[in-house]
Amino acid sequence: MSTLLIKNIHQLVTCDDGDRVLQNADIYCEDGFIKAIGTALDISADEVIDGSHMLCYPGLVNTHHHLYQVFSRNLPQVQNMELFDWLKTLYEIWKNLDEDVIRLSSLTGMGELMKHGCTTCFDHHYVFPSHSGDLLGAQRSAARELGIRLYMSRGSMDLSVKDGGLPPDSVVQTVDEIMADSVRCIEKYHDDSYGAMCRVAVAPCSPFSVSAELLRQSAILARQYHVRLHTHLCETKDEENFMLQREGIRPLEYMARLGWLGDDVWFAHGIHFNDEELRLLARTGTGVAHCPISNMKLASGVARIPEMLALGVPVGLAVDGSASNDGSSLLEELRVAFLLHRLHASRQAPTGYDILKMATRGSARLLGRDDIGQLSVGKCADLFMIDSRRLELVGCDQDAGSVLGTVGVRGPVDYTVVQGRITVRQGHLVTVDEELVAREANNKCRDYLANV
């Protein structure tokens, strides 16, 4: 039995059903779960942390990433491109992915996430070059090394350039190949138990890079195995025009006809929904992963988050891939989301606390998890803490629930705890040799890009 006790926490932001913020509270964790929250708990533990100056929050939950893109960030040739041209250029790099690239880029990306308070990462991996090996296995290995909670996906593409899609032939597969490997990945890696450290979703890339048959079969398979469905949707006007030209209908109607609505489905981006479509999402419980930094960089537009929240559309927060974000900090995403919607919606904009809830409870809902996203007894012991004595936080004690949005935290957090295990201490990863990972990843990245 492993135990952790954090004593006398300055402010504990629970994000629970009562939105409680507790002062001078203790939190006791046992075998990965929260067993007690209170004051002056008379309990011994394997490790005791003094929380007397700490702001404590539920671990952040990232609902959309492309970890393999860590090795293609800050590339000058794509800095001023919009989505379709950006993708066509980068596919020429991504077609060289292998297990080493996936393991090291995943260690880097998830390590960066964890250093900034993220305890659960969903990754949308859809590029499977022929003879590239077990890419999801490499990603699972990286997550285990770090100690982060991972939600993988068996993504896919079956339409190459010759079929009217965007990717080259070398990274697409047949529907039969994709379905067979999706079953393999679910049966090998998916754990549906409470507190699971690894789950798997079925996640075709996007309606402009996969066939209707693949989308239809993916929905059937996911429901047969009781796993979730994810894809990109309504990210750009180019996508909307592409679907209108090819199918004669808008993207969401197309997906609805193929079985892609429901509380087991969430879409990345969701920028270009009209009023009727927003109401449809709300009625069906279909979710949206909000990726503000990526949307700004690729000039994709601004998602209608205030309207979504008002209607009851499930919304979570996400960093998106490191090639369109150039980083993996959900803390940064949180503050950008707060500021972006202040600019566009003023009094209707989400508060700093609303965005925190989006990145915790909201994100957990998208992933179908009621065991993470809040600090309450019986939930997973996933949390992070920030020392309130930091220079940049002077004078910020009045509203601990909103401060991550209104003021922001730009450096690593002081502690991250996943499943009751300390994974970040004083801003540094403790489960891996951070300097060694960075050195190996940089060397591999240089070799990878040199072969393009």
Model-derived features: where do they sit?
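Alpha-helical scaffold segments that flank or form the walls of functional sites
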Residues: R73-H124, P129-R149, A180-Y194, N442-N451
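Metal-coordinating catalytic core of metallo-dependent amide/deamination hydrolases
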Residues: H131-G270, E276
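His/Asp/Glu-enriched, well-ordered alpha-helical/loop segment
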Residues: R257-D264, P306-R390, T406-G408
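Active-site gating loops and adjacent loop-to-helix segments of metal-dependent hydrolytic enzymes
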Residues: F71-I102, H131, L159-V175, K237-D264, ...
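C-terminal cap of metal-dependent C-N hydrolases
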Residues: C15, C380-A438
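Histidine/acidic-residue-rich catalytic or RNA/ligand-binding cores of hydrolases
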Residues: K162, K237-I249, E277-A282, A299-M308, ...
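N-terminal metal-binding scaffold of metallo-dependent hydrolase/deaminase domains
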Residues: M1-I43, M54-L55
